[in-house]
């Protein structure tokens, strides 16, 4: 009796001699004058294809098998044999090929030629069938699994924070509003929208971060993390911005900024190590076709110590560098991507953790240092991408937190529960946010962030 195998398993030497059922999509078909056809089959379980040898003796050979083309779906029953072909361990000698669905060669968008990533974004429902996007999906899966394993093995609890919220973690106001009010008949009181008639009885938004809610659980359960979609209504049409993306956000009670840095560094190294070990074919593809330095870069980072650098020293290095930056460097301004890349690619040539940023450019929840001018913020910078992690030690002192909220014109009534955490058993605690898509860009070398998420959401684009 035949056993169903993935193509990933059927390509291993251990499968030789087994009668199997494989299912997948045809990549190519070529016919031999000797009376058989070679099918290249892929099912998404791995980067590589498996070769199927279909004999002319099969009953549907002339009517169906010889009409197969890229995109057709089939089931194959056959014997796994050692392949004499170069670069492949096994092949399948088919005893039956069942055709499930054909793909018209005249209209099927994925032809043998290379397609631009811009074109593939217009057919996001088909791009997982390409080498590039199949590889991205597998690496994305590996990274997510690695993140969960890292935190679970370290005693963190995985919690779920709300997607719909009434608070703005970043205080930037760039949030998507959620409402059931009819937009052409919005109820008003004294020229203002009457939100008491809305679903939640108040303004509600899609979350920009689960951090504040994660702090609730950290301040009762110790170490937690959340991993889910977040939303930013920034009108940014760049290769680094999405309106919807995925974030992992750990929060740790009794952790200071140094502890926070250590967790962030260990997590990144674990992710990079797992990707290299578990997705070798996919990474070889990215190294060959996208960026010839990705594997070497990851290997160097795994073996390197991340540089810890105060913001003030970073500004001194940048101003003394002699580089002509598009954006001038001054103490008190946020560093731009070009500054971050100079530090990681030219000056230190390794990842850098910047910390102790100016108070006025960071959110209200970051702990104020004793100098009164800086806060316990940190950003992890990596070559080619720049910032990949942002975090801080949180402000645990009630009076200081209230003053910071006042400075940033935040209404304390909307954060009463957040202030309560400082009233009852307050504790030093820290956390950070890691953008999944930024990590994927770095690991794969993909230039545009829209190509590392299945269905990109950007200004003017919400297809599928």
Language model feature labels by segment:
Residues 2-249, 253:
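Class II aminoacyl-tRNA synthetase-like tRNA-binding/catalytic domains
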Residues 164, 174-273, 284-464:
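A translation/RNA-centric and nucleic-acid-associated enzymatic feature enriched
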């Amino acid at each position: 009796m035949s056993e169903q195998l993935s193509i990933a398993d059927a390509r291993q030497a251990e499968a030789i001699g087994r009668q199997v059922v494989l299912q997948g999509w045809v990549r190519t078909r070529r016919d031999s004058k000797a009376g058989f056809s070679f099918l290249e089959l892929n099912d998404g379980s791995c980067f590589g294809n498996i070769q199927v040898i279909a004999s002319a003796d099969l009953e549907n050979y002339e009517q169906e098998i010889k009409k197969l083309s890229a995109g057709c779906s089939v089931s194959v029953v056959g014997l796994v044999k050692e392949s004499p072909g170069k670069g492949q361990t096994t092949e399948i000698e088919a005893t039956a090929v069942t055709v499930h669905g054909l793909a018209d060669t005249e209209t099927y968008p994925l032809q043998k030629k290379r397609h631009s990533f811009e074109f593939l974004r217009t057919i996001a429902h088909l791009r997982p069938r390409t080498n590039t996007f199949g590889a991205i999906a597998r690496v994305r899966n590996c990274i997510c699994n690695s993140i969960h394993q890292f935190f679970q093995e370290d005693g963190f609890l995985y919690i779920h924070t709300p997607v719909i919220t009434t608070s703005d973690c970043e205080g930037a106001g760039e949030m998507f509003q959620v409402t059931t009010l009819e937009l052409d008949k919005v109820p008003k009181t004294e020229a203002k929208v009457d939100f008491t008639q809305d679903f939640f009885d108040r303004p509600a938004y899609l979350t920009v971060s689960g951090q504040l809610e994660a702090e609730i659980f950290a301040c009762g359960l110790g170490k937690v993390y959340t991993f889910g979609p977040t939303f930013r209504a920034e009108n940014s049409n760049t290769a680094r911005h999405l309106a919807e993306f995925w974030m992992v956000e750990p929060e740790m009670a009794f952790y200071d900024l140094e502890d926070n840095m250590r967790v962030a560094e260990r997590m990144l190294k674990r992710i990079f190590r797992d990707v290299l070990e578990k997705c070798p074919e996919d990474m070889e593809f990215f190294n060959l076709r996208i960026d010839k330095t990705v594997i070497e870069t990851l290997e160097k980072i795994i073996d390197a110590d991340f540089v810890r650098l105060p913001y003030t020293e970073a500004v001194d290095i940048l101003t003394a560098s002699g580089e002509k930056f598009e954006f001038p460097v001054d103490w008190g301004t946020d560093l731009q991507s070009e500054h971050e890349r100079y530090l990681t690619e030219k000056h230190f040539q390794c990842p850098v953790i910047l910390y102790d940023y100016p108070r006025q450019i960071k959110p209200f929840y970051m702990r104020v240092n004793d100098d009164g001018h800086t806060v316990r913020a940190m950003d992890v910078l990596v070559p080619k991408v720049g910032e990949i992690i942002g975090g801080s030690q949180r402000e645990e002192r009630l009076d200081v937190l209230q003053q910071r909220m006042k400075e940033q014109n935040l209404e304390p009534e909307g954060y009463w529960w957040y202030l309560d955490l400082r009233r009852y058993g307050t504790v030093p605690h820290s956390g950070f946010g890691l953008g999944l898509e930024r990590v994927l860009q770095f690991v794969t070398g993909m230039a545009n962030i829209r190509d590392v998420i299945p269905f990109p959401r950007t200004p003017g684009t919400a297809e599928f």
